[in-house]
Structures are given as C-alpha cells and as structure tokens.
Design a protein with these regions (language model features):
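Carbohydrate-associated surface elements
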Residues: 175, 197
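A conserved catalytic-core segment of Leloir-type glycosyltransferases
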Residues: 5, 9-11, 30, 34-104
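Nucleotide-activated donor-dependent transferases that construct or modify glycoconjugates
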Residues: 1-21
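Membrane-proximal helix-turn-helix segments that form the acceptor-binding/catalytic region
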Residues: 150-169
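Active-site proximal beta-strand in glycosyltransferases
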Residues: 3-4, 107, 122-142
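Short beta-strand scaffold positions
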Residues: 109, 171-172
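Acidic anion/phosphate-binding donor-loop and adjacent secondary structure
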Residues: 198-206
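Short N-terminal targeting/anchoring amphipathic segment
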Residues: 97-114, 118, 128
Length: 206
C-alpha cells in the first residue's frame, strides 16, 4: 500500500518548539515511521519553506520520505497567507506522483488546510481520504481570551468543507468526537477514535 500523507503548513522534520511546530509534527513523523515498520510506504508532502532543503528527504526510515513541495515563496508564511497556495500545492503533488509513476491508495491529511488539498487530490486520484484536524477552529474560539485569538470564517468554512469531503475523520479522544458532532454536525458514523500512541523506547519506568 502507498499512502500520501499531507502536512501542508508544517514539516514533520521541523525543529520542535516553534509557533507552528509541536505535537502534530511528532504525530505525523512517528505515525509514518510505524507504518513503515508494517511495510506500508508513505510519502509525507509538506510545503517547501526553504529552497536550500532538498525536496525529497529520506529521514523517516523504511523507505518513507518527506517531500517538500514548492507552493508560493519557499519561506515561512503566516497561516492566513498559506491558504492562497493550497491549489498550487495540490497541483505539484499530482505532478510529482505522475513523474515518479506512483499510485497512492489512500490520502491521510492533517489539519484543515491539508484537507483542502486532499479534496483536490481525491478528485484527481479517486481514492479515499482520512482526515485528522488536531485542532478545531470553533473550539479554539470558545476558549479564546481575545478577538485576536479567534479563528476567522475562512478556517471554519474550510473545516466544514473538509468534514463533508472526508471518508473518515480521526478523533484522538471522545471529547474531540463530541466536538465534531455537536459543533460541526458530523455524522458519528464517519468518525473513528484512535488515541495517540506512546513510544515505549523513550517513555518507560525508571
């Protein structure tokens, strides 16, 4: 099986601790590694943010790769500006797959912007999409301390669009499942709860 993993706005190999680097980066990287252990080939597609970084990086083991796809300026950009380049990102993934002669059996997208790209790939490749949001705009707005912290309609509408399109939505917890159902009206038959795993080689009793 070949999986196209999408992490549009942040690279799973990025240094942790920045504004847009943290749990999702670790999740995508470790999930990709573990799928490789099971003999599943994964290409993780992310937007190129540095022209000096090789576009294809073999750093996730078992032949799995991170592919940096040019989409807009190859520099870090604020999230609202990133949305502009999602169509270019999807088009260049399609071109990459065609040039390499790769057929992907499944798309697994992370965060809502990756989901928008996944919808374009799904239309081209006719394969199912599994989506994980990691955070939800409406939930963030509920706990925002100021207007500046609130997410705009472009994100909320984008999330709803992705929820309608996805074949399955992964929730990490029952609480997240409830948020998807009650805040967005997602059918519970579309949601599957898969709790994040633990790397027992790193976390163990002492």
């Amino acid at each position: 099986m070949n999986i196209a993993m999408l992490s549009y706005h942040t690279c799973p190999l990025a240094t942790l601790g920045g504004k847009d680097t943290g749990g999702m980066n670790v999740y995508v990287a470790e999930l990709t590694r573990q799928l490789g252990v099971d003999g599943i080939h994964v290409d993780v597609f992310t937007r190129s943010q540095d022209e000096h970084v090789p576009h294809v990086v073999h750093s996730l083991g078992y032949g799995n790769r991170v592919v940096h796809i040019p989409a807009g300026p190859e520099v870090p950009l604020p999230k609202p500006e990133l949305a502009t380049y999602i169509p270019t990102f999807a088009e260049n993934i399609i071109r990459f797959a065609a040039e390499k002669g790769i057929h992907y059996d499944l798309i697994h997208s992370h965060y809502w912007m990756s989901g928008i790209a996944a919808e374009m790939l799904k239309a081209e490749w006719k394969v199912p999409v599994i989506q994980m949001f990691h955070t939800l705009g409406l939930m963030k707005n509920r706990i925002a301390q100021s207007e500046e912290e609130k997410e705009g309609d472009y994100r909320i509408n984008g999330e709803r669009q992705v929820m309608r399109m996805a074949d399955r939505i992964v929730a990490a917890t029952q609480a997240e499942e409830a948020q998807l159902e009650f805040l967005y009206g997602v059918d519970d038959q579309k949601i599957v709860i898969i709790p994040p795993g633990v790397d027992v080689s790193r976390f163990y009793p002492i």
